């Protein structure tokens, strides 16, 4: 249902407070012509209500010739900030950047974060922002799960659909998303509520089966037939099935880069207010579909780049694929069974 401008501003005030914005802070709102003007205005007004020093940085849109579609998660690499050092410095000068245009997976974002500036991404429709308004309890549950993930040295996924996937861990850090940026150098995304890490380089092995009803992003469609992925030494080596498997093969082949087949981040969803069904109620250009990435008990894996944590794969093609009804084990300890979070107890929704 529609969210009023007043409610949207109140929501931003809540999230900015969680992000430790007050009269001592400066807030930059990063925008472009395609940013939701209501989101931009609400962020500006909320920051002013909190007596922060607020300013806007507006950049022109950027489209790479190889990018397909309007979903900005589909292409990784250059952004409107690439080569624009003056704009980058203006963002680095802020304590918090509210990103309404999306710098994700860009080297400039990593450089900004290294200065201690915090970044909060907010690009979903207001109705989605309202339903998944972050809470301190979201953070508590995600951090409880992070404790286990940081200690784990292996992740194993199984499902009745046929998935049987193993990934050695430890080379890369665990990353949390709980919806607000409250620590120096932290990037987060409102809405969210999940965690992930990356397999050790060239090590993931096994089979992942996309069952009927599972989701491929950025295609933003529900699978209507099974797709089987064979994985060897960290890379997808086979994509089997019917038309949808053929479509996926053709899409990835288009980028003409063997790195697109690498398994990237892997983790699970912890957000009970995110809904697997929500994507079917939105147009494809409505947003990023964070419901799919965050819904409670999913197994979320991605393909493509891992440079954001110091990996060696820099490639433009990025897929996020959340699976339902999986069993997930860390060092043989179950954390998700049949799509339901079972451990740690502190991470479960009540």
Curated annotation (Swiss-Prot):
What is the recorded name of this protein?
2,5-dihydroxypyridine 5,6-dioxygenase
- Which coenzyme or cofactor does it need? Fe(2+)
Indicate which residues the UniProt annotation says bind Fe cation: 265, 318, 320
Q: In which pathway does it act?
A: Cofactor degradation; nicotinate degradation
Specify the domain of life of the species encoding this protein: Bacteria
Q: What does this protein do?
A: Catalyzes the dioxygenolytic ring cleavage of 2,5-dihydroxypyridine between carbons 5 and 6 generating N-formylmaleamate in the aerobic nicotinate degradation pathway.
Under which main EC class is this enzyme filed?
oxidoreductase
Which InterPro entries does this UniProt record tie to the protein?
M29_Exopeptidase (IPR052170)
Which SUPFAM superfamilies does the entry mention?
Thermophilic metalloprotease-like
The record lists the organism as Pseudomonas putida (strain ATCC 47054 / DSM 6125 / CFBP 8728 / NCIMB 11950 / KT2440)
Q: What does the entry give for GO biological process?
A: nicotinate catabolic process
The protein's UniProt keywords, in alphabetical order, are: Aromatic hydrocarbons catabolism, Iron, Metal-binding, Oxidoreductase
EC number of this enzyme = 1.13.11.9
Q: Which reaction does it catalyse?
A: 2,5-dihydroxypyridine + O2 = N-formylmaleamate + H(+)
The UniProt record lists the keyword Transmembrane helix: no
Example of a GO MF term: 2,5-dihydroxypyridine 5,6-dioxygenase activity
Q: Explain the consequences of disrupting this gene.
A: Cells lack 2,5-dihydroxypyridine 5,6-dioxygenase activity.
């Amino acid at each position: 249902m529609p969210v009023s401008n007043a409610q949207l501003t109140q929501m931003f005030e809540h999230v900015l407070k969680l992000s430790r914005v007050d009269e001592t802070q400066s807030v930059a709102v990063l925008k472009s012509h395609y940013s939701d003007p209501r989101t931009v205005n609400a962020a500006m007004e909320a920051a002013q209500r909190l007596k922060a020093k607020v300013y806007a940085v507006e950049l022109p849109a950027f489209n790479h010739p190889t990018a397909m579609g309007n979903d900005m998660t589909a292409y990784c690499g250059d952004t409107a900030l690439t080569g624009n050092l003056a704009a980058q410095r203006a963002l680095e000068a802020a304590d918090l950047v509210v990103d309404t245009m999306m710098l994700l997976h860009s080297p400039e974002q990593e450089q900004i974060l290294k200065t201690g500036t915090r970044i909060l991404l907010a690009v979903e429709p207001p109705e989605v922002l309202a339903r998944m308004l972050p809470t301190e309890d979201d953070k508590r549950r995600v951090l409880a799960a992070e404790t286990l993930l940081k200690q784990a040295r292996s992740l194993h996924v199984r499902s009745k659909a046929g998935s049987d996937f193993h990934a050695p861990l430890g080379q890369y850090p665990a990353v949390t998303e709980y919806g607000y940026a409250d620590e120096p150098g932290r990037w987060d995304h409102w809405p969210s509520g999940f965690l992930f890490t990356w397999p050790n380089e060239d090590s993931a092995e096994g089979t992942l089966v996309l069952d009927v009803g599972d989701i491929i992003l950025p295609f933003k469609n529900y699978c209507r037939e099974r797709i089987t992925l064979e994985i060897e030494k960290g890379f997808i080596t086979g994509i089997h099935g019917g038309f949808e498997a053929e479509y996926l093969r053709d899409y990835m082949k288009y980028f003409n880069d063997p790195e697109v087949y690498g398994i990237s981040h892997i983790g699970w969803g912890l957000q009970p207010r995110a809904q697997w069904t929500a994507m079917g109620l939105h147009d494809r250009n409505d947003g990023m579909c964070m419901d799919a990435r965050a819904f409670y008990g999913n197994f979320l894996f991605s393909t493509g780049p891992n440079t954001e944590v110091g990996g060696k794969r820099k490639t433009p093609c990025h897929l996020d694929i959340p699976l339902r009804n999986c069993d997930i084990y860390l060092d043989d300890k179950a954390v998700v069974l049949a799509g339901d979070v079972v451990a740690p107890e502190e991470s479960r929704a009540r």
